[in-house]
Amino acid sequence: MKHILRIFSGYWLMFIILVGFTYAMVMANLWLPDKMSEIVNNGIIKQDMPAIWHNGLAMILVTAAGGLCSIVIGFLAARIATGMAQKLRTELFERVESFALADFNKFSTASLITRSTNDIQQIQMTSILLLRLALMAPIMAIGGLQKAIHNAPNLSWIIALAVSVLLVVIAMLFVIAVPRFKKLQTLVDKLNLVTRENLVGLKVIRAFHNEKIEQKKFQQANTELNKMNLFVNRLMMLLDPIMTLVMNFSSVAIVWFGAHLISSGNLQIGNMMAFLEYAMQVIISFLLLSMVFIMVPRAAVSVKRVGEVLDTLPSIVDPQSPQQLPHDATGKIEFKDVTFTYPDADLPVLSSINFTAEPGQTTAFIGSTGSGKSTLINLIPRFYDVSAGQILLDGVDIRQLKLEDLYDQIGYVPQKGVLFSGTIASNINYGNAKASQKLVEKSAKIAQAAEFVSELKNGYKNEIAQGGSNVSGGQRQRLSIARAIAVEPNVYIFDDSFSALDFKTDAKLRSALAKETKHKTVLIVGQRINTIMNADKIIVLDEGKIVGQGTHQELMKDCEVYQEIAASQLSEDDLQKMSATTAKGAA
C-alpha cells in the first residue's frame, strides 16, 4: 500500500479538485428533490404557474451543472487512476529489470506477467471506482438521510430497515467472496504458466505428439479459473436483484405509509415524493459503498502482489564507493578461491576455483554436464555473486565496480542466441548504441553474418520478428556473436555459442575472431573437444572443481577426466594421432 500512496501523492492537486467537484455534484443531487417538493406543494396543488416555472428552470440549471461536474469527476478519476497505473507498471518493469538471476527465482515468469498486467489493471479499475464513488457515497448517504428525516421523520424507519437488510446481505457476500479473490489471481498465474509453457515448447509438444495432453492441462487450468470466476461473478450479481427488491419494497412501503400520513393531514404529497427520492439516494449510496468494500479486498490482493515485487530489493547492486578500473585496463580475469552455492541449495556448485585468464589468450572450459562451466562464467558479469573468494578484473574485485563499468568490459554470448524485435542493425548495436554502420558491418563480417544479411531485401534494415523467429538458429547465433563484437570489449565470453554452426562456418568465424581478439581476453565454454582444443589454456571441471589446467597436449597426457571426454567424443584414429602429437611434443 505504501507504493500506491507514494504514487498517489503526486496527484494531490487533481484529487483536491476532484473532491470539490464531487461535493458540488452531490449537493446538486440533494437539492433537486426539495425543489420537486416545492413544485408539487406550492405549484401544482396551489396552481401557481410562476412557482412551477421558477423552480423547474432552477432544477434544469442545477441538473446541467451536476452533469458537468460528473463529467469532470470522470475525467479526473480516469486521469489519476491511469497515471498511477502507468507509473506503477513502469516501476515494476524497472525493478524486475534490476533483478539478479537469483531474484527471479522468487517469482515465476507467468506470475510476473500477471502482476504487471492483470494486477495493475485491477488496481486501476478499483482506483477509478474509489475516486468516483468512495467520496460521493458517504456524502450522499449522510445528506440524503438528513433531508429525508427533515421531510418525513415518521417514515425514516423504512430507510433504516432497508439499509439494515442491505448491510446484512453485503456482509454475507463479503465474507464469502473475499477469500476467493486471492485464489482467483493465483489461478490466473496458473493459466498464464500453462500458456507460456505451451508457446515456448510448441516444437517439442508437436514432435512428441502430446497436443492432447497439453490441451487437457490447459483445459483443466482454464476450467478452474472459469469456475472461480463464475462463482465470484454470481455472488456479485446477487446484489442486483437484492437491490431491486429492497428498493421496490421500500418504495411501496413509503407510498403505502406515506398515503396514510397524507390522508390524516400529517404529511404533504410533495414531502412524501421528496422523501422517496432521498430514500433511494440513501439506499443507492449504501449499495455503492458495498461495491467499494467488495472491490477493495480484491484490489488489495493485487496491491500486495505488486508490492511483493517492488519490495524485493535487487541482490546485486552498485557498491556505495565504487572503484575505477585502471586507465589501461586489458581485461585480465583472476579467480581466487571462488566458491559458489545457489540460493537455497545445500551444496556448492563450484569449490575453490583458482585460475587466471590473460589478455591475448583464449581460456576454454570443458567438463561433463553439471560440472559448473556455465555457472562459472556467469559469475564474471555478476549474474550471480560468489559465495566466497574473489573475481578480479584487472586487479579490481568486480563487486567493487559499478555494474555499468563492468558490463562495458564484457561481450557476452549465451548458449541460445537471443534476438529482439527490431532491425538487424539494432540487434547488432544493442550493446553499443554509438556503434557506427561501419562497425556494425565489420562485426557482422567477423561473425560470418554479412553474407546472409546481404542477401536480404533490406539488408541491415531487415526486420527481426519477435524472438528472432524469422531467422535460423545458426543465423541467430551469428548475430548474437556480432552483437558482442560490436561492443568492442576487453573480455569476450562465449557460453557454448558455436554449437549451431556448421564446421565450415565455425572455422571461418574462429579464424576471423582470433584476429579481432588477439589482444583481448577470450573465455569459451565448450561441450566438444574439437571446438576448444586450440585454446591457449583449457580448464577441466568435474563436480564443481578444477581437475586439470593446461593445453590440449598437456591434458591428454596428465588429466584423466579430459582423456575420458576425448575417448567418448573422438574416434580411435583421432586419439592415436593426438597421442602421437602429444608424444612428439613431449620429446
Residue ranges and their predicted role:
Residues 10, 14-27, 38, 62, ...:
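Transmembrane helices of ABC transporter permease
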Residues 326-587:
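ABC-type nucleotide-binding domain
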Residues 98-102, 118-131, 135, 139, ...:
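An intracellular "coupling" helix at the cytosolic face of ABC transporter transmembrane type-1 domains
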Residues 48, 143, 147-164, 175, ...:
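Helix-loop-helix
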Residues 46-47, 82, 90-114, 118-120, ...:
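Short intracellular "coupling" helices and adjacent cytoplasmic loop segments at the cytosolic face
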Residues 16, 20, 53-57, 61, ...:
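Internal alpha-helical transmembrane segments of multi-pass membrane proteins, especially GPCRs
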Residues 1-32, 36, 44-60, 65, ...:
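Membrane-integrated ABC transporters
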